[in-house]
Amino acid sequence: MGISERLTAAGLSAGEAERKTGLFEAAEQRLALLTRRACKSAPRWFVPGRIEVFGKHTDYAGGRSLLCAVERGICVVAQPRSDRVVRIADAILGLETSPTLSDEQESPENGSWRAYPAAVARRIARNFPGVLAGADIAIASDLPRSAGLS
């Protein structure tokens, strides 16, 4: 079963599932450039976008939120690494960053795209100190920027 069929079986409309195939191909190509090897068998995930209908900025403070998923989202293709580096490349925006799994790393400039992956790497290192392996990750997203979707 191909990626489009799996996405349709998981609930995406046929048209959106087909569009995600192109995003997965873009992410796969970007990962191949990043790792300098073919990535046809690399694991892949689709993360649907969400709209916060009610409760914005309350969920992380213990409050309640009402969310709904949308058919736009982020396509992820990844492979493990043997070191603590997490290389992340955005196939659409052409951005790349390589934080390490360490809670002592310096933060990129505030507001930079690179700050988000760095914060995740720091949090993983802090919460899961036994994690010793990083990953090469390529993403491709059709979430509109600055549209209130996450």
Please report, for each region that a protein language model flagged, where it lies by residue:
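ATP-binding N-lobe of GHMP and related small-molecule kinases
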Residues: 1-150
